[in-house]
Amino acid sequence: MAFLKKSLFLVLFLGLVSLSICEEKRENEDEEEQEDDEQSEEKRGMWSKIKNAGKAAAKASKKAAGKAALGAVSEALGEQ
C-alpha cells in the first residue's frame, strides 16, 4: 500500500511539474506574439504614413508638372 501511495504521489508531482512548465512556455509564447503584433502594427502605421506622403508628393509633382507644361505652351504660343 505504501508503494502505491509513493507511486501515485510521484506521478502527480511529475504531472504538476510538466503542467507548470507547459504553462510557462505558453505564457512566453503569448508574450512574444503580442510583441510581434505590436511591431507589425507599428510597421503598418509607418507604411500607411509613407504611402500617404507618396500620394501627396505625386499630387504636388503632377500639379507642378502641369503648371510647367502650361507655362511652356503659353510661352510657345506667345512667341508666335
Swiss-Prot record:
Residues 24-48 are annotated as: Disordered. Residues 1-22 form the signal peptide. One of its GO terms (cellular component) is extracellular region. It comes from the Eukaryota. Expressed by the skin glands. It is found in: Secreted. InterPro entries: Dermaseptin_dom, Frog_antimicrobial_propeptide. Pfam families: DD_K, FSAP_sig_propep. Residues 23-42, 79-80 form a propeptide. Coiled coil: none annotated. Disulfide bonds: none annotated. Keywords: Amidation, Amphibian defense peptide, Antibiotic, Antimicrobial, Cleavage on pair of basic residues, Secreted, Signal. Residues 29-40 have a biased composition (Acidic residues). The modification Leucine amide is found at L77. Belongs to the frog skin active peptide (FSAP) family. Dermaseptin subfamily. Possesses a potent antimicrobial activity against Gram-positive and Gram-negative bacteria. Probably acts by disturbing membrane functions with its amphipathic structure. This is Dermaseptin-DA3. It comes from Agalychnis dacnicolor.
